[in-house]
């Protein structure tokens, strides 16, 4: 083993706390890791590590299925999803299952089917996980070389990377096929207040799709989070799926170039750190997406975005006061700016008052009232429809505010209000988890780099201070 690669850089690649690598056994003596170090004991036991991963997948899928069935059992069709603390049914609804015009739930059976399928498949994964963890071969290299690997084998590692990329690409295309051929997906922008429709006219122009990546992340630009039509979203998945599949084929057929061999650390812990970094980035992006985007995450299911609830409040009071005789075009507010309407920095007519900061909001209930120069005064006077008033009043009272103890609403809200938006939950949880994943990335990257440099040996167990302390009992 010692002669494989440069000693300085690649040995000891796996960072053990004591001892050297040994293939058999999963105890501290043979692996250098105690039971609480989890999968670190399985670094060189590919069969057992497979079992751990399959069992983990089983737990994930079981949660999805059980939580899905729990939400179905508690679901009240007469109330909006976002009032019921649901986080899984809104995703199924967004995919167009069981949904009619306006986001109304017309059939809960597809949700039940989804839950049952996940619970059943979790049993298969659970059995596979237990089999490989307890009964299957400890290592796969001898009997099943296709599934075996050595962490330092760069060619094998990029082949595994390629297989993963192909699977991700297939996943992206599943959404494309659902939108194109299998009933379509929910479009919050469909005329008359949202509906399920098949996406026929995909956006495949690279300048449009990759233009999102070149946008500023700030303000009205919003990077990829600013996407606001389904043609772009589904077209983006065509591009993404194709890139993943072709990239996967490339990584299977090729070996890493010399610069990559030199630049990267090639050890199990290094791969773990790369994966944690990637998941962290995904989590931060998902956080922003669910918080700001009301196309991929329709407000009918997830509740309004923060800017949307704020603009809805301004709109609701504009409607009320206009009915009471106010001239909303010229009324002056307490600051000397327009009370109901004012101009944005670039000259558009926007809602006045505190909601001016959210002037770039786009929402299906508001866009029909815009003209070429922002909000159109004549439309505001003549064209406001009852459904727009109802929806804005509903969104105004369901802003994504609230604390962890589920006391919802603004700070002045009475205690009887018990509402926390799924947007708050999903964005907060993804931000927190992304942060933890990032810290894990730093930790494991540091250990992997130190091991590759040959100076990280961990704590010497023989002289660990706790060994000389009085036993607790």
Swiss-Prot record:
Co-factor: note: Binds multiple chlorophylls and provides some of the ligands for the Ca-4Mn-5O cluster of the oxygen-evolving complex. It may also provide a ligand for a Cl- that is required for oxygen evolution. PSII binds additional chlorophylls, carotenoids and specific lipids.
GO terms under biological process: photosynthetic electron transport in photosystem II
A single GO molecular function term of this UniProt record: metal ion binding
GO (cellular component) term, any one: chloroplast thylakoid membrane
Amino-acid positions noted as binding [CaMn4O5] cluster in the UniProt annotation, renumbered to this chain: 367
Principal localisation: plastid
Propeptide, chain numbering: 1-14
Thylakoid listed as a keyword: yes
Keyword Chaperone applies: no
Record keywords, A-Z: Acetylation, Chlorophyll, Chloroplast, Chromophore, Manganese, Membrane, Metal-binding, Phosphoprotein, Photosynthesis, Photosystem II, Plastid, Thylakoid, Transmembrane, Transmembrane helix
Bilayer disposition of the protein: Multi-pass membrane protein
InterPro entries hit by this protein: PS_antenna-like (IPR000932), PS_II_antenna-like_sf (IPR036001), PSII_PsbC (IPR005869), PSII_PsbC_sf (IPR044900)
Function: One of the components of the core complex of photosystem II (PSII). It binds chlorophyll and helps catalyze the primary light-induced photochemical processes of PSII. PSII is a light-driven water:plastoquinone oxidoreductase, using light energy to abstract electrons from H(2)O, generating O(2) and a proton gradient subsequently used for ATP formation.
Assembly mode: PSII is composed of 1 copy each of membrane proteins PsbA, PsbB, PsbC, PsbD, PsbE, PsbF, PsbH, PsbI, PsbJ, PsbK, PsbL, PsbM, PsbT, PsbX, PsbY, PsbZ, Psb30/Ycf12, at least 3 peripheral proteins of the oxygen-evolving complex and a large number of cofactors. It forms dimeric complexes.
Family under the similarity heading: Belongs to the PsbB/PsbC family. PsbC subfamily.
Protein name: Photosystem II CP43 reaction center protein
Source organism of this protein record: Aethionema cordifolium
Organism lineage string: Eukaryota, Viridiplantae, Streptophyta, Embryophyta, Tracheophyta
């Amino acid at each position: 083993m010692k002669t494989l690669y440069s000693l300085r850089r690649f040995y000891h690649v796996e960072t053990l706390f004591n001892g050297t690598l040994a293939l058999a056994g999963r105890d501290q003596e043979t692996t250098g890791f105690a039971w609480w170090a989890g999968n670190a004991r399985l670094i060189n036991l590919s069969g057992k590590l497979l079992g751990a991963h399959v069992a983990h997948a089983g737990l994930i899928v079981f949660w999805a299925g059980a939580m899905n069935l729990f939400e179905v059992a508690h679901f009240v069709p007469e109330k909006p999803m976002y009032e019921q603390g649901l986080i899984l049914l809104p995703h199924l609804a967004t995919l167009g299952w069981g949904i009619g015009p306006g986001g109304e739930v017309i059939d809960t059976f597809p949700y039940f089917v989804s839950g049952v399928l996940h619970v059943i498949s979790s049993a298969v994964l659970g059995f596979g996980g237990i089999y490989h963890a307890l009964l299957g071969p400890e290592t796969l290299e001898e009997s099943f070389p296709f599934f075996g690997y050595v962490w330092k084998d760069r060619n094998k590692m990029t082949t595994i990377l390629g297989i993963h990329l192909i699977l991700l690409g297939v996943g992206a295309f599943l959404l494309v096929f659902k939108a194109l051929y299998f009933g379509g997906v929910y479009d919050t922008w469909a005329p008359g207040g949202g509906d399920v429709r098949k996406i026929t006219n995909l956006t495949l122009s690279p300048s449009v799709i990759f233009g999102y990546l070149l946008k500023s992340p700030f303000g009205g630009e919003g990077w990829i989070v600013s996407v606001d039509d389904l043609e772009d979203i589904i077209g983006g998945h065509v591009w993404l799926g194709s890139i993943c599949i072709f990239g996967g084929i490339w990584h299977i057929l090729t070996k890493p170039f010399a610069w990559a061999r030199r630049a990267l650390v090639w050890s199990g812990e290094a791969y773990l750190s790369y994966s944690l970094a990637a998941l962290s980035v995904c989590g931060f992006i998902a956080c922003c997406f669910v918080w700001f985007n009301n196309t991929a995450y329709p407000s009918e299911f997830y509740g309004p975005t923060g800017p949307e609830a704020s603009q809805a409040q301004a709109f609701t009071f504009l409607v009320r006061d206009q009915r009471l005789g106010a001239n909303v075009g010229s009324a002056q507010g307490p600051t000397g700016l327009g009370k109901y309407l004012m101009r944005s920095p670039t000259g558009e007519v926007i809602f006045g008052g505190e909601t001016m900061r959210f002037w770039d909001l786009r929402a299906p209930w508001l866009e029909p009232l815009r003209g070429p120069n922002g909000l159109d005064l004549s439309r505001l006077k003549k064209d406001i429809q009852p459904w727009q008033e109802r929806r804005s009043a509903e969104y105004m009272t369901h802003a994504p505010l609230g604390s962890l103890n589920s006391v919802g609403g603004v700070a002045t809200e009475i205690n009887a209000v018990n509402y926390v938006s799924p947007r708050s939950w999903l964005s907060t949880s993804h931000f927190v988890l992304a942060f933890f994943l990032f810290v894990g990335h730093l930790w494991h990257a540091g250990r992997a780099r130190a091991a590759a440099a040959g100076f990280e040996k961990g704590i010497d167990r023989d002289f660990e201070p706790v060994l000389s302390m009085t036993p607790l009992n």
